[in-house]
Amino acid sequence: MQKFYQRLKENQKERARCAFLVLYFGVLAVLLFLARPLLDTTAADREWSIHFLFPCLLACIILTTVVSFCRFAAKPDQKPKPRYVGWKQPILMLANAAYLFATLEFVTNSQFREMKWYYALLNIGVIFVLSILVSLFLNSIRRAMIFMNIFYFCMSLVFYYVYLFRGEAFQLIDLYSIATAADVVGGYKFEITGEIVTSFITMMLVVRLWLQSREYRFARKTRNKILLRVAAAALTLGTYLAYMNLNWNAEFGVISDLWNPAKTYRQYGTTVGFTAVAKYMRLTPPDGYSKDEVTAIADTSEKETKTEDLRKDNADACQALCL
């Protein structure tokens, strides 16, 4: 402890980092208390919030603060070299995948508690595979987990608000109309729920822990890094081909309701439901689609509309002269 105090006294950067940690966890604690009314929307939620959710979130903030400061105090003067991935890291990645599944369903799925356990395991497995692919491309367990946590929180907001505003679940095909969505998004009123606040706080805590964790990599030398990316690309391609060509969804009992994707998401989980529906809704134009023909039809329709308006204006002018 004396060494830690001496380091803070002599090093301005260390004092700034310590102040940032205090501010970081202080803001999360204040946010939790300010968002307390959002956790008590109904009588049942209020009872659950008072006796479980709010105390657990507060305890998580306190515990993460203690762990974070202990890590900060025990940090060596020199940055430790990255280690190779061992058997412990996949276990942590699997635990993180389970957490990502739980937070995504907590925000977006009103039937989360009714989901069958083997569908929950299937969702965790899919997220775990995605985590492995990302970690291979980034050559870093820590950076991959930080990316996955932030990405899944953002996707939970996308799934929640798209369904709230449109009444239909977000699908892969919606990426075609992302520009239109960006134009109209300002006209909607965004309301934050208790689930979103809870997910945000836990995400920030988990990201903080991953930021202070030891760096583990698959390769160190440049040649090995290049080979790793090539292998990751080949593995990704193989995973995609298996995903598109194998009847995995039927084998696991996942029935895609293409007319009501939200039902599929709620029943089988958002991750599995999204991938199952996306399998039959590719980002490819339908048969016979021609951009030039669509443009020509639109131009013709616009000209006909202008002609009809001109005729109507002439008729109104003639009628006015007659009167």
In which residue ranges do the predicted regions lie?
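Soluble catalytic regions of membrane-associated enzymes that act on cell-envelope
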Residues: 246-323
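Transmembrane and membrane-interface helices of multi-pass
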Residues: 2-265
